[in-house]
Amino acid sequence: LLGVLAFARACIFLAPPSVTTLASASVNGTFMPICRVETDQKKVALTFNCTYSAQDMQQLLEILKEKNVHATFFVSDAWAKNYPELLCTIHNAGHDIGGLWTTQASLSIREQTLTLENLTQRIDRLTDSETTLFRFEDGNYDNSAIRLIQESGGYPVQWNINSMDWKD
């Protein structure tokens, strides 16, 4: 149903305030995004990537409201540009909004910084809030991409369970 809209990712990254999360963890010298957070509570974070279409979004929002489920929507710059009213609707419904950022190795650090800034500014302007969560659209990242997000005051977030619905 929602495969056209976005692919859902369930990942544990929300935690009670007493848990400290580190976005700068590294494994063998590679910086890692937040994929989960240690907590004694049984919680999952339901996330959606919004990239191309807004098909089924109203139905999704109705289901989330009916079930009293909070989600985080990671939106690309193009999606935010094409569906600004819907972005505001999602935000006003109490869901978190994060940036869905595409990194490209062919771009210079300055060009990557500009794409991240453009994405952040568009979301911030439309939602009248500060964007601090970022996800890599294709799941690919490197140390410089993680560093750019951290230097902007943001947190890189990925998934740890992939629904694979994008294959349908």
Which functions belong to the PLM regions below?
Residues 13-14, 30, 153:
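Compositionally biased, intrinsically disordered/low-complexity regions enriched for serine, proline
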Residues 14-24:
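Aromatic-capped interface at the extracytoplasmic side
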Residues 22-111, 115, 120-122, 130, ...:
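Active-site beta->alpha N-cap acidic-glycine motif
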Residues 130, 140, 145-168:
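His/Asp/Glu-enriched short active-site or ligand-binding loop at hydrolase and phosphoryl-transfer sites
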